[in-house]
Amino acid sequence: MNTTSSKSKKKQDDQVGTRFLGVRRRPWGRYAAEIRDPTTKERHWLGTFDTAEEAALAYDRAARSMRGTRARTNFVYSDMPPSSSVTSIVSPDDPPPPPPPPAPPSNDPVDYMMMFNQYSSTDSPMLQPHCDQVDSYMFGGSQSSNSYCYSNDSSNELPPLPSDLSNSCYSQPQWTWTGDDYSSEYVHSPMFSRMPPVSDSFPQGFNYFGS
């Protein structure tokens, strides 16, 4: 039993020494780290540590101090070749990569006019005007065609006209032929006064535009 225990303990010590450079396990369970100076071939004692990783890190610090980027280390360092370490574990001493720089603020002014033009373009059904043709009669009896436009936006709808005004202002005059003269029967608007009677001295009737 004692022989078997000694062999397994020695095998464990060999595995620790093989895994990490410059690390040896002490009989009482702690780990010692030492390094050999490449110039003088002397061994330098680095201390005793509770874990093998701490002892391996002490070795790496001493090796990098002596040999620089040509050192053989236990852990991976970003400033050294990947093949220089005996493990793939990243060293705790290796600083994390810097965070990406923040995005530069945008200095472009907001084009409110462009936004308004896009919103008020003819593609918008809320802002498309509708035009209708309205036939109206002038007092001289000549017919003219007028157009007006309105928007279909319900929020801008005008209130209805009063009944007396709507029945009188937009009524068309009724013309009656009586022979040699013109006579008219029409409904007057409250906003306009009655037209003066036509004098017999004007043989051409209603000729407002001159001869």
Curated annotation (Swiss-Prot):
Residues 93-107 have a biased composition (Pro residues). It is found in: Nucleus. Keywords: Activator, DNA-binding, Ethylene signaling pathway, Gibberellin signaling pathway, Nucleus, Transcription, Transcription regulation. Its main location: nucleus. Residues 19-76 bind DNA. Expressed in germinating seeds. Present in young shoots, at low levels, especially in leaf primordia and developing leaf blades. Also detected in vascular tissue, mostly in xylem, of young leaves, petioles and hypocotyls. GO terms for cellular component: nucleus. One of its GO terms (biological process) is positive regulation of seed germination. Induction: By imbibition. Residues 81-92 have a biased composition (Low complexity). Residues 1-21, 74-110 are annotated as: Disordered. The keyword Oxidoreductase does not apply. It comes from the Eukaryota. GO terms for molecular function: DNA-binding transcription factor activity; transcription cis-regulatory region binding. The keyword Cell membrane does not apply. Belongs to the AP2/ERF transcription factor family. ERF subfamily. Cell division-promoting factor involved in leaf blade differentiation, inflorescence branching, as well as in carpel and silique shape. Promotes the number of xylem cells. Positively regulates the gibberellin signaling pathway leading to germination, hypocotyl elongation, and leaf expansion. Probably acts as a transcriptional activator. Binds to the GCC-box pathogenesis-related promoter element. May be involved in the regulation of gene expression by stress factors and by components of stress signal transduction pathways. This is Ethylene-responsive transcription factor LEP.
